Amino acid sequence: MKALDKIREIVNKFSFNIREAQEIICHVLKIDKIQLYTENPEITSEQAHTIKSLIERRLKKEPLQYIIGECYFYNIKIKVGRGVLIPRPETEILVEQVLERQKLISNTGNRILDLCTGSGCIALAIGKNAPEFQIFGIDKSEKAVKYATENKALNNIKNVIFLVGDMFNPFKEKIFACITANPPYVKTDEISKLQPEIKNYEPLEALNGGEDGLNFYRKIIENAEKYLLNSGLIFLEIGQGQAKAVQNIALMSGFNVIEVVKDIAGIDRVMILQKSKSL
């Protein structure tokens, strides 16, 4: 059977998403979408068996990114699998905001700390686009740091170092010009309401932000001033409806709220804080 015929069969038989069917076929055949449509290769019986297995996994709601083993984030390839959070397009907004303030950050210093680094996507995207920075990505999950380290090698990015650790523990005080984080921010009692792809497959420790979803914001903001240089910045991804609560934590800790940036859906998504010179 030809590849395009196989895609039509999958879509019709399982009411399958056509884009996902294309990605699975391309993954198994080791071709891109242009080759898929220009060459329309024949599928061998062995490839058909592999495709069937991957389709069955997706029908069980396993995320496509885990099935294929990779995704793209800010134009870099990121390897992912069970035990590491899948990068979201919304998180690219945080990277954009850091890069827009590249000169401002450089005026303070050249070290950036990426907390809860996971796959390393934020640290690597910044590192690739701003080679003058030295970036440290930290996560308490050894599996996540293993993926992050592999992604560093995959993309040949030299100015990023990944470490296993709990928040700020490995670092000396007052050395960072900027802190970035996409921390766990889902309320504990809301995890059961998430899509099955998320709650049944992605690591809960990368999602669970505690009873009110704010545990990690408190840990980050309340400790950040000890590690930031004067006028240093914090870039935080936040969940829907959390802006006011996170802003209050920031103000109580002596940080100025510089901006809250919305995502494409109009939801507050990234909060930018600055360390007061008086801290």
UniProtKB/Swiss-Prot annotation:
Keywords: Methyltransferase, S-adenosyl-L-methionine, Transferase. S-adenosyl-L-methionine binds at residues 139, 182. SUPFAM superfamilies: S-adenosyl-L-methionine-dependent methyltransferases. GO terms for biological process: methylation; translational termination. Its EC number is 2.1.1.297. GO terms for molecular function: protein-(glutamine-N5) methyltransferase activity; protein-glutamine N-methyltransferase activity. Pfam families: MTS, PrmC_N. InterPro entries: HemK-like, N5-glutamine_MTase, PrmC_N, RF_methyltr_PrmC, SAM-dependent_MTases_sf, Small_mtfrase_dom. It is an enzyme of class 2 (transferase). Substrate binds at residues 182-185. It catalyses: L-glutaminyl-[peptide chain release factor] + S-adenosyl-L-methionine = N(5)-methyl-L-glutaminyl-[peptide chain release factor] + S-adenosyl-L-homocysteine + H(+). Methylates the class 1 translation termination release factors RF1/PrfA and RF2/PrfB on the glutamine residue of the universally conserved GGQ motif. Belongs to the protein N5-glutamine methyltransferase family. PrmC subfamily. This is Release factor glutamine methyltransferase.
